Amino acid sequence: MIAIIDYGMGNIRSVEQALKHIGAAYIVTSDKEEIFRSDGVILPGVGAFPKAMDVLEEKDLVRVLQEIGRSRKPLLGICLGMQLLFEKSEELQDCNGLSLLPGVIRKLKVPYKIPHMGWNELKKEGEIALWNGVEDGSFVYYVHSYYADCPNEIVYGISEYGVKVPGFVAKGNIYGAQFHPEKSGDIGMQMLKNFKGVVETWKSSQLSI
């Protein structure tokens, strides 16, 4: 069972539809016990970083997500949800994040239209489980004005938009997509299928303990 975190700032409906499409069992929840009982977690998000962190704090989900991230349970952040995984953001004000990944969220300062919205090429950097069946140079769908300034060793996908935008990051059990896999057609569905596979592998490993 995959828990989709519902904190009032997520693209919940489209993520639900995507998981339904790939046959994944899921629950939409903000209940701590349900999140801990799940086999994997998706943290979606649309909106401002400081507001999102305030809401997560109010719902006592900051601690929950940090515990999930520091365990071996698979965690996938999408768009703002990915940004929240980092140490802090410069959006509106300096604001601390979940600190599960090293790096800072900074405003895109490019001679192009902001937000970066639409389809862009994703170049793979290294291999991870979520790349199974995903061709290098596939196009994915973005909507964002900020990006992760983070170490190269956690970047597994890059798009160009005046700067190199980390489109996909990963460290251990933690994954983050700056783009929207649930809106990225067959390629996005394949990535979500791969995440489902990672979740199932983790669940099997727990049953054997």
Swiss-Prot record:
Q: What terms describe the molecular function in GO for this protein? A: glutaminase activity; imidazoleglycerol-phosphate synthase activity; lyase activity
Annotated catalysed reactions: 5-[(5-phospho-1-deoxy-D-ribulos-1-ylimino)methylamino]-1-(5-phospho-beta-D-ribosyl)imidazole-4-carboxamide + L-glutamine = D-erythro-1-(imidazol-4-yl)glycerol 3-phosphate + 5-amino-1-(5-phospho-beta-D-ribosyl)imidazole-4-carboxamide + L-glutamate + H(+); L-glutamine + H2O = L-glutamate + NH4(+)
Q: Where is the active site?
A: C79 (nucleophile), H180, E182
Q: Where in the cell is the protein located?
A: Cytoplasm
* A biological-process GO annotation: L-histidine biosynthetic process
Q: Which UniProt keywords apply?
A: Amino-acid biosynthesis, Cytoplasm, Glutamine amidotransferase, Histidine biosynthesis, Hydrolase, Lyase
What region holds the Glutamine amidotransferase type-1 domain?
1-205
Would you tell me the Gene Ontology cellular component terms?
cytoplasm
Give the metabolic or biological pathway: Amino-acid biosynthesis; L-histidine biosynthesis; L-histidine from 5-phospho-alpha-D-ribose 1-diphosphate: step 5/9
Q: Does the UniProt entry include the keyword Amino-acid biosynthesis?
A: yes
Task: Give the chief site where it resides.
Answer: cytoplasm
Q: How does it assemble?
A: Heterodimer of HisH and HisF.
This chain's function reads: IGPS catalyzes the conversion of PRFAR and glutamine to IGP, AICAR and glutamate. The HisH subunit catalyzes the hydrolysis of glutamine to glutamate and ammonia as part of the synthesis of IGP and AICAR. The resulting ammonia molecule is channeled to the active site of HisF.
HAMAP family per record: HisH
- Protein name as annotated: Imidazole glycerol phosphate synthase subunit HisH
Q: Which organism is it from?
A: Bacillus cereus (strain AH187)
